[in-house]
Amino acid sequence: MKIICLGTSAGLPTKERNTQTTILSLNPLYNEYWMFDCGEAAQHQILHTSIKLGRLTHIFISHLHGDHIFGLPGVLTSRSFQGGQDKKLTLYGPTGLKQFVDTVLTISCSHLNYPLEIIEIDHGDEFVINDIEITVGALKHGIPSFGYRIVMPDTAGNLIKEKLIAEGIAPGPVYKEFKLHEQVTLNGKIYNTKDFKTAGKKGKKLVFFGDTMPCENEVSLAENADVVVHECTYLDGDVELSHKYCHSHIDDVLSLVSSGSVKKLIINHVSNRYTTKDINRLLAEINTKTECEVFIADDFYEYDIE
């Protein structure tokens, strides 16, 4: 699995950065992509990658500001011609998202050749998709804004075939029973299958935040996360100014990941006032202030989730 940042700019695109779009590639667990926000020209950014729109199955919108949704009409309509025919797409987002999509498609006389479901979300909503758990949390911004906590399913350990053979259990269909179940009864004997497996892995916890200033719900969403993708429009300067515009300051974000024991922080939604030189300097300073691994994403940054 990997996270791919297709757009990382705050508010407006720049020559180096597009507006907000993030992809979660679920390969090899599932052969599909999820998108978090869909900024202007998102489909153009996709052309620079190996991502296939036909394998995009779910889009999660944090809020309805233009830099997070103006790419939707292009992505939705182009998907019809890029392998998406007859493949359902589900769109999640705040109240008003359905009206936005319906209006754009109607006025432009656009017709999709696949089923589109639009689910308008609220705080505390929970969904399960392919055994992946999604929790929605309300944030604090100028308009309703949400974060999404994604918990991947646990993965079972691998069979230790040598142990089974040593126990006199020959390879065959029974091995599948040992892999799937906690106990197996064979020839009148009960086996605890954990004795014949390597240790399993806990599912990764990933959190994708929309625009927000500090709020209580952030803390519960981020708790013990393996990866947090968080806006940080203000990488330095006046904390109060960032809150005036309902955005996060770097001090806010570092406090969040510290209190939540977050392992990896990916910063996006970077103000266009910061040059590449500024970002490199600030990142070096940031990494002296936290034990969490921090990276300020640029467009097409990829992070492998092991």
Curated annotation (Swiss-Prot):
Annotated Pfam families: Lactamase_B_2
Sites where the protein binds Zn(2+) 1: 63, 65, 141, 211
Catalytic residues identified in the record: 67
Cofactors (names): Zn(2+)
Assigned EC number: 3.1.26.11
Chain's role: Zinc phosphodiesterase, which displays some tRNA 3'-processing endonuclease activity. Probably involved in tRNA maturation, by removing a 3'-trailer from precursor tRNA.
Family assignment from sequence similarity: Belongs to the RNase Z family.
Protein's UniProt name: Ribonuclease Z
Taxon lineage: Bacteria, Bacillati, Bacillota, Bacilli, Bacillales
